[in-house]
């Protein structure tokens, strides 16, 4: 995302009902990449996953990025979803700021209604049917929310993740998603390269 593209405040959700597809890793990578394009203090990562993956990593690696830990669990769902919603509303009046929300796995309808209020949803998934099937169901639920409220946002971007090097055939994914209003982003290759990029500092987060 180029600097001149971040004039208006943006809320980006990283979401999928399926666990283990790389939501926290993608949130970390996105925050670090944006920190090279815009002032890091203009970036807030809201970690709603009880595992605290994004919180623990970014607090140590990029303390200049704002991190808020608001776990969305059955015990705290109503309160913390309301707090996340408040953050997003406040962010709308802060031009040049970006909020990244790392969401947990699960099927909370209230959470997905909140996700639908964002500017963009990044949806990581592997190419396996075990991940593509629930991913398609999640996209279908987002389509329904957008249709119900006649909304053009959020933009849905599917992020092929954990892709082996040399893998070039994405026809299975394209076929599964052809009837949905989504964009398929560039593949994120095997995370061994990511760990190398972080000079060994990144632990085994791929199942977070």
Feature-to-residue mapping (PLM):
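Structural beta-sheet core signal
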Residues: 44-45, 101, 123, 158-160
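Inter-motif core of Ras-like GTPase G domains
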Residues: 110-129
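Conserved C-terminal guanine-recognition region of P-loop GTPase G domains, centered on the G4
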Residues: 135-151
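Beta-strand-loop-alpha "switch" segments that mediate conformational coupling across diverse proteins
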Residues: 162-167, 174-205
